């Protein structure tokens, strides 16, 4: 009975390995279980958080409009908006993509944009912010 159970478990393990063949292209990677998010702060001319409307994140490589996919994208810090999270990593290249982030101030109706470079990809454990503004300030 023990031999049958052992053979059955080995068979299941082999089938599981074959189903995960697509991830084997990435080599042996150890990833953490954290969930990474990246965002941007919109501020008024005094540096205080500014509420915005019409938040837009456009991948400049693909033209695709991106949205943070997690329910954690709602921020409790005024003016800070989560724009992407690990659920978006397959929409990004490993080299990093330029993302045009745009928002319109509710107070002044002024629209401002910034470019932020974020990487991801099939083999990435998490998204990673490479460069770009961390704050957009309205006049």
Model-derived features: positions:
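Sec-dependent bacterial lipoprotein signal peptides
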Residues: 1-20
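Structural motif
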Residues: 41-50
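Solvent-exposed strand-loop boundary residues in beta-sheet-rich modules
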Residues: 46, 61-63, 107-109
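Solvent-exposed loop and beta-edge segments used for protein-protein assembly and interaction
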Residues: 32-34, 93-95, 108
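Extracellular beta-sheet/turn segments enriched in Thr/Pro/Gly and aliphatic residues
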Residues: 25-29, 109-139
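Tryptophan-paired
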Residues: 51-100
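Bacterial Sec-dependent N-terminal signal peptides
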Residues: 16-37
């Amino acid at each position: 009975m023990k031999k049958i159970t052992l053979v059955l478990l080995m068979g299941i393990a082999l089938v599981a390995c074959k189903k995960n063949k697509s991830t084997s292209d990435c080599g042996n990677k150890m990833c953490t279980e954290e969930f990474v998010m990246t965002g941007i702060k919109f501020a008024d001319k005094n540096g205080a958080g500014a509420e915005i409307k019409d938040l837009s994140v456009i991948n400049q490589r693909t033209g695709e409009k991106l949205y943070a996919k997690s329910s954690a994208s709602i921020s409790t810090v005024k003016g800070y908006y989560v724009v992407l999270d690990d659920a978006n990593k397959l929409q990004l290249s490993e080299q990093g993509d330029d993302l045009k982030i745009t928002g319109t101030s509710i107070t002044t109706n002024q629209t401002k944009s910034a470019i932020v470079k974020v990487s991801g990809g099939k083999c990435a454990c998490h998204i990673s912010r490479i460069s770009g503004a961390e704050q957009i300030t309205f006049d």
